[in-house]
């Protein structure tokens, strides 16, 4: 049992700042300004200039993906593609018997070349092992020739396929992601997830909303994350959102919620130039992005999920996708009104006035 003395931010409805917090084996047993007699001989930690706050909640995380990336190579701090190539070269040397490697964090905006590392550059430092370098936004990747040769038959006809640079976007990226996730063993995934949880807890995160269904066969990651969450004994909380447009994926696993990105993504993202826009992009590429589904499909999904009593989340970054999400949720709630539905739209980087009005009127 430990007593913390100092500034304790409770973050309750009144924003109360208490002077004492007592915890016993991870459970808070007292919070207040006067320390009760039974706790006066408890070991005390003086906070001094520090402040005790509740654990943070990460409300949108792809846990299986984050765990995999966390165990791989992080290139986010690289200032050039030459530096990334050198990091990959060293990573290959330390990879042992692994046949497939993963790196994360490539960005054309943080390197002096102003572009993503290319397939040719990856081939020079990693010719004999498959490698996928995931872009910082998680919506695209660059693969080397070894991996391209393995997947060419599956990705060459898909949207977002760029053989010359090795960059994969849209459906081509999803196919690459599916291959990578299915190359992981259950034991390896479990170890990676435990390491990722420990890492997040060490940075003050105590709860995550994980959006699962990132390409594992049979949506294994959804089931696995649910089981993994129940196995945690340190108070860390996990809320699982299955990324599926099939309501049964949630209901069969007795999950009260559904949605996220991947299959529930209505569009892409700005970094990959595929966020769906009401007006065309004004750069040289032009276009208005990618809207993955028509209204009919999204509305049908929302109606089924809402009638099943599920909480719904959908990815919408561009304003065109945001409007579509709002229309679909409105149609679902008009069809079957619910007071405490807790439906939400993820990201919504460019909300429109019309969409905001729907959100306000329907408590989205």
Report the location of each language-model feature.
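Glycine-enriched alpha-helix->loop->beta-strand junction motifs that scaffold or abut catalytic
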Residues: 255-259, 330-332, 358-364
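Conserved helix-loop functional segments at active or binding sites
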Residues: 304, 328-335
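Non-cysteine beta-strand/loop elements that form the S-adenosyl-L-methionine
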Residues: 62, 257-274, 363-364
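Divalent metal-binding segments
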Residues: 2-4, 9, 13-24, 28-234, ...
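Long, K/E/R/D-enriched contiguous segments that form extended
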Residues: 267, 301-311, 319-324, 350, ...
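Acidic (Asp/Glu)-rich catalytic clusters
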Residues: 231, 251-255, 338, 359-361
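Carboxylate/His-rich catalytic cores and anion/metal-binding grooves
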Residues: 143, 246-259
